[in-house]
Amino acid sequence: MNRTERFRRVALLMASFLRNLAYLRAFKDVHARIPMDWTRDFWITQGGNCTDIAVLEWCKLFADRADKHHWSRIVADLDAFKPSLLARLGMEEAAYSDYVTSVRRYRDKFVAHLDSDNVMDIPMLDIAERAVFFYHQHLTTQEVSDPLQVFRPLPSSSAELTLYFEHHCRAAAHTYNEVLPPLRTI
């Protein structure tokens, strides 16, 4: 696989992460409206699947150094990327490392395998989201000479990535609002 193909595959993982995060956030907004009937398991499973796929995709990009899509195997200037990432996230190295460990642990203990842990700590994905936006911006401004050619039809700029994410948030919210009954008040 050549470098251009690797950039494109990284962009595909980023898009998948953000789509699933958008669907998850829209799901959380309507969670209270899920009916207590035979469809409930479907909705709960759908929300959980979005979480799991988002975590899996993010781990490929940030948690597994051996993965061919991990930032350390893609970016040219390794010494500059991580400090810039940490600065963008507003985190120290230790806090970021703890966060990566928590996301990886959720993936390893509950998504990839069902280990014997009794408590499932589902990671918050706000930091993961900001990391993906940073990585995408880095690729489109520092690594890829022609992002439009490499990424199309995927977002090829930070502005396009933001629109892509917002579009999927709105699309999911619209879909949920169309199919779920309104919240009943007593």
Label every PLM stretch briefly.
Residues 93-120:
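Histidine-centered, metal-coordinating catalytic motifs and their short helical/loop contexts
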Residues 1-99, 122-186:
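Amphipathic alpha-helical interface segments
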